[in-house]
Amino acid sequence: MAKKSVIARNEKRIKLVAKYAVLRAELLKAGDYEALRKLPRDSSATRVRNRCVLTGRGRGVYAKYGLCRHMFRKFALEGKLPGVKKASW
């Protein structure tokens, strides 16, 4: 389980990205890099980390499912992920 402060920081970044998305796109299109540089650092989508929705783990996350590899395997074996089954050939 990730620290709650790390999860909260990432959620704050997600909100900032949403808040400044339109302004950032306009400035980028206009080529106003000086104004773009003055925006908050955390308003850049690059700083957002994909995290597991259950554990907060930041590495080994399947973005399509929003789960880390451990939880993905657990739920897949329990049959809780529709359409996912263990490969066999």
Curated annotation (Swiss-Prot):
User: What InterPro entries does the annotation carry?
Assistant: Ribosomal_uS14 (IPR001209), Ribosomal_uS14_bac/plastid (IPR023036), Ribosomal_uS14_sf (IPR043140)
Family, as annotated:
Belongs to the universal ribosomal protein uS14 family.
Q: Which GO terms describe its biological process?
A: translation
Question: Which HAMAP family does its entry note?
Answer: Ribosomal_uS14_1
Cited NCBIfam families: PRK08881.1
Q: Carries keyword rRNA-binding?
A: yes
Gene Ontology CC: cytoplasm; small ribosomal subunit
In UniProt terms, what function does this protein have? Binds 16S rRNA, required for the assembly of 30S particles and may also be responsible for determining the conformation of the 16S rRNA at the A site.
Tell me the protein's name.
Answer: Small ribosomal subunit protein uS14
Q: Which organism is it from?
A: Pelodictyon phaeoclathratiforme (strain DSM 5477 / BU-1)
Keywords, alphabetical: Ribonucleoprotein, Ribosomal protein, RNA-binding, rRNA-binding
